[in-house]
UniProtKB/Swiss-Prot annotation:
It comes from Chlorobaculum parvum (strain DSM 263 / NCIMB 8327). Negative regulator of class I heat shock genes (grpE-dnaK-dnaJ and groELS operons). Prevents heat-shock induction of these operons. InterPro entries: GAF-like_dom_sf, HrcA, HrcA_C, WH-like_DNA-bd_sf, WH_DNA-bd_sf, WHTH_transcript_rep_HrcA_IDD. Pfam families: HrcA. Belongs to the HrcA family. Keywords: Repressor, Stress response, Transcription, Transcription regulation. GO terms for molecular function: DNA binding. This is Heat-inducible transcription repressor HrcA. The lineage of its organism: Bacteria, Pseudomonadati, Chlorobiota, Chlorobiia, Chlorobiales. SUPFAM superfamilies: GAF domain-like, Winged helix' DNA-binding domain.
Length: 356
């Protein structure tokens, strides 16, 4: 976003309005700024500065108040140019490390359990909505496939991806099949598909197994179901969200319609995934090998999220990339959100790589 150059006074006043509003959730007036902050400016001078900020769209006046509140533009200027992010609080660092450090005895369970726990910790520490998107699997490398025989004509296909994620699908067969034939098919599939990405498997499996299909009905069934078996989109069914109560308790969302909008949005897993995935990169903070992204209000481009801010960062599991983030009101402690999200992303990357 392009801005005119704000003067030092304007930057100071805008920063104070945002920081004060984050804490109080009430509009901020010039008298409050003059009384509580040592700017060396009179009440009248501060009023003039606020008038200029309002004229340029950085703050606005709610019709019921004499004070001012930040606009989306004001928040964006703040996170891009004024925000000062320091290191994570030591107590919060210890809380995350205790669960996700590769040296921690608590780091156990499946990757799904690790991601679910990450969402809970994020929601708890930030007092917002913690969100974790599992890694995209299209570029994930297939490791091995196993088949569990559930009945004479029913099997469960278990696909392991880089030892990090497991996908299971139950298939019904048209005829009975022996355990020996199942083992033969499993061996061929693992030999020919191991090391390929899911996308490569979907597009080439027919050619790679063309000499096998005529000899084995199960192989034909596997090839025919490849788009489902090796489809990465179903990973969004395992979106991890925690802390709904933190959002609905915020003063911004006390109106019944706003509560309904928030609940509707939270129940839409694909909608949340799009919002977190499309958050706008912020040049204000560059983490360890990751850039924290922040989308504010109307930047989210959906009516149910115009009152929300999304702070997110990528994490890595081998060659796969997922997203971890926080969703909350625009009246958010941005420095704190960025610190927590960035640190959690780093810990998840280390934890999932350590699980390899």
């Amino acid at each position: 976003m392009l801005y005119r150059d704000l003067t030092l006074r304007e930057r100071q006043v805008l920063g104070i309005i945002i920081q004060s509003f984050v804490v109080s959730a009430t509009p901020v007036g010039s008298r409050t700024i003059a009384r509580n902050y040592n700017l060396g400016l009179s009440d009248a001078t501060i009023r003039n500065v606020m008038a200029d900020l309002e004229a340029d769209g950085f703050i606005s006046q709610p019709h019921t108040s004499a004070g001012r509140v930040p606009t989306d533009k004001g928040y964006r200027y703040y996170v891009d140019l004024l925000m000062n992010v320091s290191g994570i609080d030591e107590q919060e660092k210890q809380m995350i490390d205790a669960r996700f450090s590769t040296r921690s005895s608590e780091l156990k369970g499946t990757s799904a359990e690790v991601l679910g726990a990450a969402a809970k910790v994020l929601g708890s520490i930030s007092r917002q909505l913690g969100v974790v998107l599992p890694p995209r699997l299209s570029n994930a490398v297939f490791e091995r496939l196993d088949i569990v025989q559930l009945a004479s004509t029913r099997i469960m296909v278990v696909i392991a991806i880089q030892s990090l994620f497991v996908k299971t699908i139950v298939m019904e067969l048209t005829a009975e099949i022996s355990r020996q034939k199942i083992d033969d098919v499993v061996n061929i599939l693992n030999e020919r598909l191991s090391g390929l990405t899911l996308e490569e498997i979907r597009s080439t499996i027919g050619k790679r197994l063309s000499d096998c299909q005529s000899r084995e009905g199960l192989m034909n069934s596997i090839v025919g179901a490849a788009d489902t078996l090796f489809d990465e989109s179903s990973i969004l069914d395992r979106l991890y969200v925690s802390g709904t109560e933190n959002i609905v308790d915020q003063p911004e969302f006390k109106q019944p319609q706003k509560v309904r909008n928030i609940i509707t949005m939270i129940e839409d897993k694909f909608g949340i995934a799009r919002l977190v995935d499309n958050a706008l990169p912020s040049g204000a903070y560059q983490g360890r090998d990751r850039e924290v992204a922040i989308s504010i209000g109307t930047e989210n481009r959906t009516d149910n999220a115009i009152d929300l801010t999304i702070v997110s960062s990528p994490y890595y599991a081998g060659k796969m990339v997922g997203k971890v983030g926080i969703m909350g009101p625009k009246r958010m402690d941005y420095e704190h959100a960025v610190r927590v999200v960035n640190y959690m992303a780093g810990c998840l990357s280390e934890a999932l790589s350590g699980n390899n």
